[in-house]
Amino acid sequence: MSEAADVLVVGAGLAGLAAARDLTAAGRSVVVLEARDRVGGRIVNEAIGDGKIAEMGGQWAGPTQDRLYALAENLGVATFPTYDTGRKVLHFNGRRGTYTGAIPRINPLVLADVGRAQARLEALARKVPADAPWTAARATQLDGQTFQTWVRRNTASSSARKLLALGIEAVFAAEPGDVSLLHVLFYSHSGGSFQQLIDTTGGAQQDRFAGGSAVLAERLAARFGDAVRVCDTFVGVPQLCRL
């Protein structure tokens, strides 16, 4: 089948669908191809019976994510506060404990160690331009070391390193040795601070979306009708002429 369109968008996640929206608003014809049998990319609503769903991907929003909130409002998707009441559970160093508030009850010396490292991290993050992190002073050096390497050099205890690792794993879904220091600094600055990234109320996990986050992609895709093709794998683009 042959069909003409000004722009072919590959992937029907939020980025692809938002690109299609903006291109359409600019007067361009668009076709969106998605290899999966659904739209949404890394946001997924999984049915678990009785009309209920579990969110299997990205599901939170918080301060600094103004465009996401604006998109939800435009699509008529309400938000609600993430449940953050009661006692919290921490399994650390082979022990399980509960606590209230923002700070767990562990060795004060360990908390001080974490606090010093986090203060240094926040100071470094403020020096990395959120809109162009590669232009930061010593960007190559910062990108050439993992967050794990930096933590080892800036903490005195293994317990402090484990706590900081928990924060990285929660935010990035990756191990400290799998992300560069520059990326952590950029991400922290973009999100307000490293502390804000891991917080609930006032932080990146502050709100959730009624009906599940995948509703955002589903409603946005519905605006394009048949121009969004699921189960349609992109193979390649032939070069027909030299520019």
Spans of features found by a protein language model:
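FAD-dinucleotide binding site
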Residues: M1-L243
